[in-house]
Amino acid sequence: DPRRYGSYATKSYLKVKNEEAYANVFVTHFPDEERTEARPLRTAPCYDRLKALGAVFGQKFGWERANWFAPEGVPQEDHWSFRRSNYFAHIGNEVRNVTENAGLLDMSAVAKARISGPGAEAFLDHLVANKLPKKVGLVALCHALTERGGVHSEFTVQRESVTSFYLVSA
């Protein structure tokens, strides 16, 4: 599906990625495997800081995004597997830490939109299948559906005011 690629997928990028795919035709492909050619392509201002903190990156829509963080003394590299990979326990520790404390997420690579005006709520109510947040400051996970009822998109929707909503979608 060509919609998976944005303006970052230039002819030179596609040439390098095609060559990489051809060179790996007879190589075992693992779940969630990230190929290295033509990377990093797009980086957020915090990329170097995250890398220094142990980030192991993956590419999403041309953007380098931290998939997980290697603790001190652990190599910053993925070891792919059909079972649990080397990062499994580390991600579990990250989730536990964020659940019990707090976390910070680089949102540079995700789509963001503000829908505002007197018809904003009616528009979004028609667009998504879930209930919109009623109180200012509340957040809801909402889904836009296809004509056949499948999920087309997922949004985190925050009500900013009576007539304004902020949407985030990865």
Regions found by a protein language model. Give the residues of each.
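Glycine/proline-enriched, intrinsically flexible loops and inter-domain linkers
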Residues: 2-170
